From Swiss-Prot:
Major location (coarse): membrane
Transmembrane segments: 6-26, 41-61, 65-85, 107-127, 132-152, 164-184
Role noted for this protein: Probably functions as a manganese efflux pump.
Segment forming the signal sequence: none
Swiss-Prot/TrEMBL keywords: Cell inner membrane, Cell membrane, Ion transport, Manganese, Membrane, Transmembrane, Transmembrane helix, Transport
InterPro entries the record matches: Mntp/YtaF, Put_MntP
Protein's name in the database: Putative manganese efflux pump MntP
Length: 185
């Protein structure tokens, strides 16, 4: 498979991670380098590993992955988005695992939800007998870079707005809408 095709696939797979990173940045107007690294690293890692898992699974689980992946993504994103919306109405400003999507279960849920498409791509690479090592690296690096940029972009928009609770609600709604989009595809 030519480099440009792998690059296009990598960018397409990273769009969910980018969009979710923007939503997270909207909810976290103060994003540390450590938080940026955690989110970018985990999104990139999951995006890189899922095609490998899909490739290894081959044809045996193809129909199950295609059937349930949209539902899994929807529930994970709806859960995190719903928590963000709920917490935007709370007056307590303490940062727990849901307010900081770069920690705990929120990070795991978001990482899995953004990378399920990559699992299906790995499955298709297996079916077409394409090698998987270079695409995994390219997909992971692209997701890492676009996640970091998306987080910065969301943070920049949030800083421009003095309505951080509204930004958090918008971020939660965006996550739920992405989940619905994945469900309805």
């Amino acid at each position: 498979m030519p480099f440009y095709e792998i690059f296009i696939i990598s960018v397409a797979l990273a769009m969910d991670a980018f969009t979710i990173a923007v939503a997270c940045g909207l909810c976290m107007p103060e994003v540390s380098k450590r938080q940026n690294f955690r989110l970018s690293f985990h999104f990139g890692l999951f995006q890189a590993l899922m095609p490998l898992l899909g490739w290894l699974a081959g044809l045996t689980v193809k129909s199950m992955v295609e059937t349930y992946a949209p539902w899994i993504s929807f529930f994970l994103l709806a859960f995190v988005g719903g928590k963000m919306i709920q917490e935007s109405f709370e007056t307590d400003d303490s940062c727990d695992t849901y307010k900081d999507p770069t920690k705990g279960l929120s990070l795991v849920f978001l990482s899995v939800a953004t990378s399920l498409d990559a699992l299906a791509v790995g499955l298709s690479f297996s079916i077409m007998d394409y090698p998987i090592a270079f695409p995994c690296v390219m997909i992971g690096i692209t997701a890492l870079v676009l996640t970091s940029f998306g987080l910065w972009l969301g943070k920049s928009f949030a800083k421009a707005s003095s309505y951080s609770h509204i930004a958090e609600r918008i971020g939660g709604v965006v996550l739920i809408l992405i989940g619905l989009k994945l469900l309805l595809q």
